[in-house]
Amino acid sequence: EASRYLDYVQLMTYDLQGGFQKVTGHHAALYHSEGNLFDACVQKAVNGFVNAGVPMEKLILGVPFYSRKWDGVKGAGCRNGLGMEAETVGGYGGDYGELKESWIGKRGFIRYWDEQAKVPYLFDGETFISYEDCESLGVKIAYLKEKGMGGIMFWEYKCDPSGELLSFIKKNM
């Protein structure tokens, strides 16, 4: 009912897993993944709002320009660290600029792609990092266009100092 008084409803579809759990996972998965133990994803959030009566065209999809990081991952060989217990909760893991400069493909970190969830993650055998990149943004932009959503928003501008993610959004929206 409240949606009739609102121009848009911004869905903060990030931090879906992280700061409150000692189990690794995607903090902004588009779809549920078998490796992600908690059933939280963009699709489920969007469906929840639509089922509650919010028109699709009023929904704005939120994406993160920062990461979530778990240290001390146990059972590292399984699923490349996804869905595994860790010593720490998934705290702030740095912004996209930091990941590009110091983590992606460096320090022993390998970039993996979860084909079910449609998001990337990094793992070095002990540390798991969930983040957003241009590939996952492309899939989310296609999703929101297909669904007829109202647009996209992000958190936050300063986390993309090179403008790579923002430029990708501008080009593809």
Predicted regions and their residues:
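Active-site and adjacent substrate-binding regions of carbohydrate-active enzymes
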Residues: 10-13, 125-173
